[in-house]
C-alpha cells in the first residue's frame, strides 16, 4: 500500500438521497462525458432503482472521498425465465471509478470477515463496490448476476471475487422500467403512461420476450446432488451410480467449461451402456435433457424418468412421453422433437467420437445441444 493512502467511505443510495445522487451524476458527467451525456440524470437512476421497476427496487453504491463521489456501482433488478422457473437476477452496471482513485486507496471500515487493510476488498474500489452492492441483492434472495463478466472484468469476477460462471439460454422479461425511462421521464403524464406500459408488459411477459444467450455469475455454493434412488425390476432398465462414480469431461467446442458425468450401467449385468452428462453448475432441481451417442437419458426435476435401453438400441423411431425420437446409427446421430401443444422444435446431436480412459474422460462432440424439461414445458 501507499504510505499515505486516501481514505474512502462507502455510501448506500438505494433510497436515492438527492444530494449524493446529484454528486454521482456530476461524477459521471465530468469523468465519462461520452458515456453519460444522454442518460446520466435523476430520471435514469430513478427508473432503474426505485419502485418504477416492477421487477423490484435496485441497488446503488458509491465510494466517497472528501465529500465527493469517486466510484459508483448499480445493480438493476431483472426477472429471467428458464423453462417454467422464474429466476431473480440483477444486472450490474454503471460501475465506474475515477482514474485518479484506482491506486493508493483504503476504505475507512474493513469489509466484514477481513482483518487487514491490505486485503483486496479493503483497497479495491471496484471490488468493494461490486461486493457491497451484491451483498444487499443476495440478502433479498437474488441468486444471479447476468451480462457479467465482460472480457475486461472476467478475471476479477471469477478470480478475486470468487464468482462462478454459468452458461445458459434464458428468456428475459422486457418489463423493466429502464426500457421506457428515457421516454416517460420528461413529464408526469408520460411517466404515468410508462408505468402503465411496464405493468402491462409485466403481465404479458411470456408473450413479449426476447431470447438471449448470456453468462451468469453466482457466488452461491453448488447444491449437492441427491443420491438417485431408482426402483426398477425390468432387466433392460438402466441404473445411476452414486456420486463416487462421477468423472470429469470436457467438450472440444467449449474447452473452458467442465461437465460432470455419471456412468450408467445395466442393473442385470452391470454392462456399461452410456453416460449421463450435466453442467457442473446445474442445480439439483433444474435437470436438463442430454443426449450422447446411442443413449438418451431423461430427468424431470428430481423425479427420474429413464428410457429403457432396449428402446434405443437400434435404428428406429419411437415416442416417449411428449418426445418424438429418431435414432440414426448410420449417421452416428440422434434427432428428437419436443412437442409444445401444437408447436414443436427439432434438436439434433452429431457424434464425432468419444474416448474414455479411467477416471478422466475426453469427448469430441459437434453441435452439442441440450433442452430443459420442466413440469409444464411439454404439457
Language-model region placement:
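Active-site/acyl-donor-binding loops of N-acyltransferases
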Residues: 2-5, 43, 143-199, 250-253, ...
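Conserved aromatic-histidine-acidic binding/catalytic patches
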Residues: 117-125, 145, 181, 235, ...
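Short, well-ordered alpha-helical packing segments
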Residues: 73, 93-96, 126-134, 138, ...
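Hydrophobic/aromatic-lined pockets within catalytic cores
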Residues: 32-36, 138-142, 162
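Extended, charge-rich helix/loop segments that form flexible
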Residues: 187-224
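Conserved acetyl-CoA-binding loop-helix of GNAT-fold acetyltransferases
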Residues: 97, 102-137, 301-314
Amino acid at each position: 500500500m501507499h504510505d499515505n493512502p486516501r481514505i474512502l467511505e462507502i455510501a448506500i443510495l438505494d433510497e436515492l438521497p438527492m444530494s449524493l445522487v446529484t454528486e454521482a451524476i456530476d461524477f459521471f458527467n465530468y469523468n465519462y462525458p461520452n458515456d453519460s451525456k444522454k442518460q446520466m440524470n435523476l430520471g435514469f437512476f430513478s427508473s432503474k432503482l426505485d419502485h418504477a421497476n416492477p421487477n423490484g427496487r435496485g441497488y446503488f453504491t458509491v465510494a466517497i472521498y472528501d465529500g465527493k463521489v469517486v466510484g459508483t456501482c448499480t445493480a438493476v433488478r431483472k426477472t429471467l425465465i428458464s423453462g417454467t422457473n422464474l429466476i431473480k437476477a440483477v444486472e450490474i452496471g454503471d460501475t465506474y471509478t475515477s482514474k485518479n482513485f484506482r491506486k493508493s486507496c483504503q476504505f475507512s471500515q474493513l469489509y466484514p470477515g477481513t482483518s487487514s487493510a491490505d486485503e483486496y476488498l479493503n483497497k479495491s474500489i471496484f471490488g468493494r463496490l461490486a461486493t457491497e452492492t451484491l451483498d444487499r441483492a443476495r440478502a433479498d434472495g437474488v441468486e444471479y448476476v447476468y451480462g457479467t463478466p465482460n472480457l475486461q472484468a472476467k478475471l476479477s469476477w471469477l478470480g478475486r471475487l470468487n464468482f462462478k460462471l454459468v452458461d445458459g439460454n434464458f428468456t428475459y422479461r422486457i418489463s423493466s422500467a429502464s426500457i421506457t425511462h428515457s421516454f416517460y421521464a420528461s413529464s408526469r403524464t408520460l411517466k404515468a403512461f410508462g408505468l402503465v406500459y411496464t405493468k402491462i408488459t409485466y403481465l404479458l411477459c411470456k408473450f413479449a420476450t426476447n431470447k438471449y444467450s448470456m453468462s451468469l455469475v453466482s457466488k452461491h455454493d453448488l447444491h449437492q446432488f441427491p443420491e438417485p434412488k431408482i426402483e426398477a425390476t425390468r432387466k433392460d432398465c438402466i441404473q445411476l451410480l452414486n456420486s463416487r462414480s462421477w468423472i470429469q469431461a470436457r467438450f472440444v467446442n467449449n474447452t473452458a467449461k467442465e461437465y460432470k458425468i455419471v456412468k450408467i450401467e445395466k442393473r442385470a449385468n452391470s454392462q456399461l451402456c452410456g453416460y449421463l452428462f450435466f453442467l457442473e453448475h446445474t442445480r439439483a432441481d433444474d435437470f436438463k435433457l442430454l443426449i450422447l451417442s446411442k443413449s438418451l437419458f431423461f430427468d424431470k426435476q428430481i423425479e427420474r424418468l429413464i428410457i429403457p435401453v432396449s428402446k434405443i438400441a437400434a435404428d428406429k423411431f419411437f415416442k416417449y412421453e411428449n418426445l418424438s425420437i429418431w435414432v440414426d446409427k448410420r449417421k452416428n446421430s440422434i434427432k428428437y422433437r419436443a412437442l409444445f401443444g401444437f408447436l414443436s422444435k427439432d434438436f439434433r446431436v452429431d457424434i464425432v467420437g468419444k474416448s474414455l480412459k479411467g477416471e478422466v474422460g475426453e469427448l469430441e462432440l459437434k453441435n452439442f445441444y441440450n433442452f430443459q424439461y420442466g413440469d409444464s414445458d411439454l404439457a
